[in-house]
Swiss-Prot record:
Membrane topology (UniProt): Single-pass type I membrane protein; Single-pass membrane protein
Compositionally biased residues, Acidic residues: 491-503
InterPro entries: Herpes_gE_N (IPR046463), Herpes_glycopE_Fc (IPR003404), Ig-like_dom_sf (IPR036179), Ig-like_fold (IPR013783)
Region (Acidic): 484-502
TM ranges: 424-444
Protein name: Envelope glycoprotein E
Cellular localization per UniProt: Virion membrane; Host cell membrane; Host cell junction; Host Golgi apparatus membrane
Virion surface topological intervals: 27-423
Organism: Bovine herpesvirus 1.2 (strain ST)
Topological region Intravirion: 445-575
Location of region: Disordered: 186-218, 394-416, 491-560
Residues listed as glycosylation sites in the UniProt record: N141, N343
Length: 575
């Protein structure tokens, strides 16, 4: 347990007469308080079987407050305050429990009340657990715990939680009263020890002087957090959840740090919430990732919700402790309406907190990548008040065939992002599918329309040069020479094959007719000039065989030319 704030000093003059009066009536003797006490205020010793009343400070009549009584007890011997030293510089008195007693330790609520801002009890709401043996009182006239007949198991630490709300500024105090019940055997032994004469101490050897070396210079930093472990609120309240971070630096080296707030929404049927400390330092351990009691325990931070996180890189130490606010860092805050970080970038501020904000809030501070400080605060409403303890052991791993426990079935916090409704998902999917089908149909129609409008042929010039022969019924005895540009006299295939003369070629025969020349009005064909020069022509020539001799068969009458082939080719071109 962490040290808590003592009661207000202005109430001490009023408490002293009440403590003396009730101490005499209950035969309870306040024991000597350990110096430096911060969390344990008074220790009472009572006889077994005698009535005991543990008084608490009365409520202020002019403010609105929430108060509650709880007791820390267990199967082991009743806890008692003991001195606790964090190091050689800081020591205080707190309740210490053995590791074997942690599983049986319990913080049981006794009573809780909400007091209105008026002098009388009108408007007060009080809830007291029905226990005929122990009765807790939170009235305006009497505040305390009344035990009809004290027993040994009634020993323990009784806490009075008091929080002022409204215009009082959310002031919180926690008073701890320790009760020790002495049995009859212990009382007889104490009386026998008082009757024995005191003997002087036996002188021993002279003390040996030893020289102590100065401790080595420390490096790094040290952090401490002192939050309240429980915070009871009413839906709609606005309050500050503070961890009271304390920082101490031993050198000037820059450092990196991170601040994380984790939230665990507790199940409604959990009677005890365990925080496994080993899982905070080893979040990736299999037992921490899959604990057996996942719904009622805080194991690995990876299993919880991150409500606020801030990362600092290359931060300079600040002796005044303002480094979380002065250093630059990247921050993340959960998008919830009722939660935001405080101005110091460490604490949390709740604005109009709803009932769904109840749960366990765990604070973790890392220094250069290592966890240096952590603690928790149980923020709940009065109807969901449960117990929370820190467990220093490893959690039990869930069975391999056991189903993964899910989060508790509770409503989401107000303003938290929620998933879309199933009907909305179906509607959006249907609209999207219809849109895709429409786009595909439109694309097919456009492509078909373009294909129907596109010409599958190119317009060719039907009047260009065509290399063909005139239709005739006679055997094809026509020689088509090359074009004029490639024509040479020394390569004339129509020259005499038996001629061995290498001189210039003779002029073409007189019977060669140029079909491409300009026609004459008398004969329709132009004879080639004698000098062999020709005007620009298409390059097509047709050579006809000489008329046969007289002994040959008479020539047949010329048939009409067949232009079907030419017409078919022209049609194919014009298509």
């Amino acid at each position: 347990m962490q040290p808590t704030a003592p009661p207000r000093r202005r109430l001490l003059p009023l408490l002293l007469p009440q403590l003396l009066l009730f101490g005499l009536m209950a035969e309870a003797e306040p024991a000597t308080e350990t110096p430096g006490s911060a969390s344990v205020d008074t220790v009472f010793t009572a006889r077994a079987g005698a009535p005991v009343f543990l008084p608490g400070p009365a409520a202020r009549p002019d403010v609105r407050a929430v108060r509650g009584w709880s007791v820390l007890a267990g199967a082991c011997s009743p806890p008692v305050p003991e001195p606790v030293c964090l190091d050689d510089r800081e020591c205080f008195t707190d309740v210490a429990l053995d590791a074997a007693c942690l599983r049986t330790a319990r913080v049981a609520p006794l009573a809780i009340a909400e007091l209105a801002e008026r002098p009388d009890s009108t408007g007060d709401k009080e809830f007291v657990l029905a226990d005929p043996h122990v009765s807790a009182q939170l009235g305006r006239n009497a505040t305390g715990v009344l035990i009809a007949a004290a027993a040994e198991e009634d020993g323990g630490v009784y806490f009075l939680y008091d929080r002022l709300i409204g215009d009082a500024g959310d002031e919180e105090t926690q008073l701890a009263l320790t009760l020790q019940v002495a049995t009859a055997g212990a009382q007889g032994a104490a009386r026998d020890e008082e009757r024995e004469p005191a003997t002087g101490p036996t002188p021993g050897p002279p003390p040996h002087r030893t020289t102590t070396r100065a401790p080595p210079r420390r490096h790094g930093a040290r952090f401490r957090v002192l939050p309240y472990h429980s915070h009871v609120y009413t839906p709609g309240d606005s309050f500050l959840l503070s961890v009271r971070l304390q920082s101490e630096f031993f050198d000037e080296a820059p450092f990196s740090a991170s601040i994380d707030w984790y939230f665990l929404r507790t199940a409604g049927d959990c009677a005890l919430i365990r925080i496994y400390e080993t899982c905070i330092f080893h979040p990736e351990a299999p037992a921490c990732l899959h604990p057996a009691d996942a719904q009622c325990s805080f194991a690995s931070p990876y299993r919880s919700e991150t409500v606020y996180s801030r990362l600092y890189e290359q931060c300079r130490p600040d002796p005044a402790g303002r480094w979380p606010h002065e250093c630059e860092g990247a921050a993340y805050a959960a998008p919830v309406a009722h939660l935001r970080p405080a101005n110091n970038s460490v604490d949390l501020v709740f604005d109009d907190a709803p009932a769904a904000a109840s749960g366990l809030y765990v604070f973790v501070l890392q220094y250069n990548g290592h966890v240096e400080a952590w603690d928790y605060s149980l923020v709940v409403t009065s109807d969901r008040l449960v117990r929370a303890v820190t467990d220093h052991t490893r959690p039990e791993a869930a069975a391999a065939d056991a189903p993964e426990p899910g989060p508790p079935l509770t409503s989401e916090p107000a303003g938290a992002p929620t998933g879309p409704a199933p009907w909305l998902v179906v509607l959006v999917g249907a609209l999207g599918l219809a849109g895709l089908v429409g786009i595909a149909a439109l694309a097919v129609r456009v492509c078909a329309r373009r294909a129907s409008q596109k010409r599958t042929y190119d317009i060719l010039n039907p009047f260009g040069p065509v290399y063909t022969s005139l239709p005739t019924n006679e055997p094809l005895d026509v020689v088509v020479p090359v074009s004029d540009d490639e024509f040479s006299l020394d390569e004339d295939s129509f020259a005499d094959d038996d001629s061995d003369d290498d001189g210039p070629a003779s002029n073409p025969p007189a019977d060669a007719y140029d079909l491409a020349g300009a026609p004459e009005p008398t004969s329709g064909f132009a004879r080639a000039p004698a000098n062999g020069t020709r005007s620009s022509r298409s390059g097509f020539k047709v050579w006809f065989r000489d008329p046969p001799e007289d002994d040959a068969a008479p020539a047949r009458a010329p048939a009409a030319p067949d232009y079907t082939v030419v017409a078919a080719r022209l049609k194919s071109i014009l298509r």
